[in-house]
Amino acid sequence: MGLSFKNNVNKISIESNRLFHAKNKNLEKVFDKFIVSAKKRAQSNIQQNKSVDNGDLRNSLKVTRKKNKNIKQWKLIVNSVHGAFVEFGTRKRANPPSSLTSYANTFRGMKGESGDVVKRLTDYFKRKGFSEDGIGSAIMDVLKNGTKPHPFFFPAVWYSQRRLPRSIRKALKKKR
Protein backbone atom coordinates (compact mmCIF):
# COMPACT_ATOMS: atom_id res chain seq x y z
CA MET A 1 0.00 0.00 0.00
CA GLY A 2 1.32 3.44 -0.84
CA LEU A 3 0.44 6.70 0.82
CA SER A 4 2.67 9.77 0.90
CA PHE A 5 2.39 13.24 2.37
CA LYS A 6 4.46 16.16 1.12
CA ASN A 7 4.24 19.70 2.32
CA ASN A 8 6.03 23.01 2.05
CA VAL A 9 4.98 26.57 2.68
CA ASN A 10 2.65 26.84 -0.26
CA LYS A 11 1.44 23.29 -0.78
CA ILE A 12 0.42 20.08 0.93
CA SER A 13 -0.16 17.02 -1.18
CA ILE A 14 -1.39 13.52 -0.49
CA GLU A 15 -0.75 10.74 -2.96
CA SER A 16 -2.12 7.25 -2.77
CA ASN A 17 -1.77 4.43 -5.20
CA ARG A 18 -4.44 2.21 -6.66
CA LEU A 19 -3.76 -0.70 -4.28
CA PHE A 20 -4.27 1.52 -1.26
CA HIS A 21 -7.68 2.61 -2.51
CA ALA A 22 -8.66 -0.88 -3.55
CA LYS A 23 -8.52 -1.76 0.14
CA ASN A 24 -11.29 0.65 0.95
CA LYS A 25 -13.21 3.19 -1.12
CA ASN A 26 -13.99 5.25 1.98
CA LEU A 27 -10.43 6.58 2.05
CA GLU A 28 -11.17 8.96 -0.80
CA LYS A 29 -13.82 10.64 1.35
CA VAL A 30 -11.37 10.84 4.26
CA PHE A 31 -8.73 12.60 2.15
CA ASP A 32 -11.31 14.93 0.61
CA LYS A 33 -12.47 15.89 4.09
CA PHE A 34 -8.87 16.28 5.31
CA ILE A 35 -7.80 18.64 2.54
CA VAL A 36 -10.98 20.74 2.70
CA SER A 37 -10.79 21.03 6.50
CA ALA A 38 -7.12 22.11 6.26
CA LYS A 39 -8.14 24.80 3.76
CA LYS A 40 -10.99 26.06 5.95
CA ARG A 41 -8.76 26.13 9.02
CA ALA A 42 -6.04 28.02 7.12
CA GLN A 43 -8.62 30.57 5.96
CA SER A 44 -9.85 30.88 9.53
CA ASN A 45 -6.27 31.35 10.76
CA ILE A 46 -5.73 34.14 8.24
CA GLN A 47 -8.85 35.87 9.53
CA GLN A 48 -7.94 35.37 13.22
CA ASN A 49 -4.35 36.57 12.67
CA LYS A 50 -5.73 39.74 11.11
CA SER A 51 -3.66 38.92 8.03
CA VAL A 52 -6.55 39.85 5.77
CA ASP A 53 -6.09 43.05 3.82
CA ASN A 54 -8.06 42.73 0.63
CA GLY A 55 -8.49 38.95 0.74
CA ASP A 56 -5.79 38.02 -1.78
CA LEU A 57 -4.08 35.55 0.53
CA ARG A 58 -7.28 33.99 1.83
CA ASN A 59 -8.68 33.65 -1.68
CA SER A 60 -5.42 32.18 -3.01
CA LEU A 61 -5.93 28.88 -1.15
CA LYS A 62 -6.86 26.28 -3.76
CA VAL A 63 -7.72 22.59 -3.44
CA THR A 64 -6.95 20.36 -6.40
CA ARG A 65 -7.71 16.70 -6.91
CA LYS A 66 -6.05 14.69 -9.60
CA LYS A 67 -7.00 11.12 -10.32
CA ASN A 68 -5.62 8.82 -12.91
CA LYS A 69 -5.49 5.08 -13.29
CA ASN A 70 -2.77 4.41 -10.71
CA ILE A 71 -2.53 7.48 -8.47
CA LYS A 72 -4.91 9.81 -6.70
CA GLN A 73 -3.54 13.11 -5.50
CA TRP A 74 -4.98 15.91 -3.37
CA LYS A 75 -3.27 19.29 -3.00
CA LEU A 76 -3.87 22.41 -0.98
CA ILE A 77 -1.95 25.26 -2.56
CA VAL A 78 -1.29 28.82 -1.40
CA ASN A 79 -1.15 30.56 -4.74
CA SER A 80 0.12 33.91 -3.45
CA VAL A 81 3.54 35.53 -3.63
CA HIS A 82 3.42 36.79 -0.07
CA GLY A 83 2.21 33.57 1.60
CA ALA A 84 5.68 32.68 2.91
CA PHE A 85 6.24 36.20 4.22
CA VAL A 86 2.98 36.11 6.18
CA GLU A 87 3.64 32.56 7.44
CA PHE A 88 7.22 33.14 8.66
CA GLY A 89 7.60 36.92 8.97
CA THR A 90 10.33 39.00 7.37
CA ARG A 91 13.74 40.42 8.21
CA LYS A 92 14.54 40.70 11.94
CA ARG A 93 11.04 39.65 12.95
CA ALA A 94 11.08 36.38 11.03
CA ASN A 95 10.47 33.59 13.52
CA PRO A 96 9.72 30.23 11.90
CA PRO A 97 9.12 27.09 14.00
CA SER A 98 12.35 25.19 14.63
CA SER A 99 11.17 22.29 12.48
CA LEU A 100 10.78 24.66 9.51
CA THR A 101 13.81 26.92 9.94
CA SER A 102 15.83 25.50 7.06
CA TYR A 103 12.81 25.59 4.79
CA ALA A 104 11.91 29.15 5.82
CA ASN A 105 15.49 30.24 5.11
CA THR A 106 14.94 29.45 1.43
CA PHE A 107 12.71 32.54 1.30
CA ARG A 108 15.30 34.91 2.78
CA GLY A 109 16.28 37.55 0.27
CA MET A 110 13.41 36.62 -2.01
CA LYS A 111 11.55 39.51 -3.57
CA GLY A 112 7.82 39.75 -3.10
CA GLU A 113 5.51 41.44 -5.53
CA SER A 114 7.16 43.71 -8.06
CA GLY A 115 6.48 47.41 -8.18
CA ASP A 116 6.75 50.29 -5.76
CA VAL A 117 6.98 48.86 -2.24
CA VAL A 118 6.58 52.22 -0.54
CA LYS A 119 3.39 52.96 -2.49
CA ARG A 120 1.93 49.53 -1.64
CA LEU A 121 2.78 50.00 2.04
CA THR A 122 1.34 53.54 2.02
CA ASP A 123 -1.91 52.26 0.51
CA TYR A 124 -2.00 49.42 3.04
CA PHE A 125 -1.50 51.69 6.05
CA LYS A 126 -4.12 54.13 4.75
CA ARG A 127 -6.62 51.27 4.49
CA LYS A 128 -5.75 50.29 8.06
CA GLY A 129 -6.56 53.80 9.29
CA PHE A 130 -3.06 55.12 10.05
CA SER A 131 -2.71 58.89 10.20
CA GLU A 132 -0.70 60.64 7.50
CA ASP A 133 1.99 61.40 10.08
CA GLY A 134 2.26 57.81 11.28
CA ILE A 135 2.49 56.20 7.85
CA GLY A 136 6.09 57.29 7.22
CA SER A 137 7.42 55.85 10.47
CA ALA A 138 5.40 52.65 10.00
CA ILE A 139 6.87 52.17 6.53
CA MET A 140 10.41 52.77 7.84
CA ASP A 141 9.80 50.22 10.59
CA VAL A 142 8.61 47.58 8.10
CA LEU A 143 11.50 48.25 5.71
CA LYS A 144 14.08 48.14 8.52
CA ASN A 145 12.73 45.45 10.85
CA GLY A 146 10.30 43.47 8.71
CA THR A 147 6.92 42.07 9.66
CA LYS A 148 5.90 39.66 12.40
CA PRO A 149 4.93 36.13 11.40
CA HIS A 150 1.25 35.29 11.22
CA PRO A 151 1.28 31.51 10.72
CA PHE A 152 -1.80 30.21 8.98
CA PHE A 153 -0.86 27.31 6.70
CA PHE A 154 1.26 24.95 8.79
CA PRO A 155 -0.88 25.19 11.95
CA ALA A 156 -3.90 24.27 9.82
CA VAL A 157 -2.10 21.34 8.20
CA TRP A 158 -0.71 20.06 11.50
CA TYR A 159 -4.09 20.31 13.19
CA SER A 160 -5.73 18.33 10.39
CA GLN A 161 -2.89 15.78 10.27
CA ARG A 162 -3.32 14.96 13.96
CA ARG A 163 -6.88 13.87 13.23
CA LEU A 164 -6.12 11.99 10.03
CA PRO A 165 -4.89 8.63 11.45
CA ARG A 166 -8.11 8.18 13.41
CA SER A 167 -10.19 8.98 10.32
CA ILE A 168 -8.18 6.49 8.25
CA ARG A 169 -8.67 3.77 10.87
CA LYS A 170 -12.42 4.40 10.86
CA ALA A 171 -12.54 4.27 7.06
CA LEU A 172 -10.60 1.01 6.96
CA LYS A 173 -13.03 -0.58 9.42
CA LYS A 174 -16.05 0.36 7.32
CA LYS A 175 -17.26 -2.13 4.79
CA ARG A 176 -16.88 -1.27 1.14
Please name every model-derived segment.
Residues 1-176:
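Short, Lys/Arg-rich flexible segments
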